[in-house]
Amino acid sequence: MFEPITTAQAYITPDNATTEIPRVINAAIQQRRPVHIHLPIDVALTEIEISNPFKPEVEPQKNVQSYINMVQDKLESATQPVIITGHEINSFHLHKELEQFVNQTQIPVVQLSLGKGAFNEENPYYMGIFDGSIAEQDIQDYVNQSDAILNIGAKLTDSATAGFSYQFDINDVIMLNHNEFKINDTCIEAFSLPNILNGLNKYIHYKNTNDFPQYERPQAHNYELS
């Protein structure tokens, strides 16, 4: 029953505990998603021998240059690029890496409501929240008219986009998510989000010069209680 909402599951026995528990913990760390370990009550107090203490597996960095070059080509042909970011940045703690990429490319950023906190709202390239047809009109206009949309660590779900109410061409979206790289007809599931962001920072040589709406921070109000 837990399989649809977890990334790994294990039913623990005295014989498999030393392999299954590390496997599931590694899955939780690498995928940043919930896991489920079923530990029967008659097994919980069983003593077992552990030959080596647990150490998280280090996921190797893969060569993403040829795929990042496709992103470079898309940006060079674009007139109005934008970055949509979301919750995976929070899950993988990639705020610094994302901000580095934004600062060096000067591409404006919007967040999905699901990913609030994914990007520094004090950054001059931050535009605000994009949630489809209920976003601020100037943000709607800019994002919907963009011809190169870098979707970094975000999911364009119905709840995050007001029922899929965005108006941009989905073919202009480059998916740069954990285990999901998609541009045109190229789909790869082998790259982690940290791997992708490191590749963006290393191989993208592009600077945006297009104007974009400036984020206006809500003003604080002084209320008097009577």
Where are these regions (language model features)?
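Well-ordered alpha-helical segments embedded in enzymatic catalytic cores
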Residues: 20, 66-70, 138, 196-199
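Cofactor-pocket helix-loop regions in the catalytic cores of large enzyme subunits
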Residues: 15-16, 25, 29, 38-124, ...
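Short acidic-hydrophobic, aromatic-tinged amphipathic segments that line or gate anion-handling sites
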Residues: 8-16, 127-133, 176, 187-200
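A broad, structure-centric signal for solvent-exposed, well-ordered loop/edge residues
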Residues: 9, 44-46, 50, 96, ...
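Short acidic-hydrophobic sequence patches enriched in Asp/Glu that either
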Residues: 1, 135-138, 192
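Structural signature of the thiamine diphosphate
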Residues: 2-52, 74, 139-176, 206
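Phosphate/pyrophosphate-binding active-site segments
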Residues: 50-51, 168-226
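Glycine-rich, anion-gripping cofactor-binding loops and their flanking helix/strand elements
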Residues: 87-174
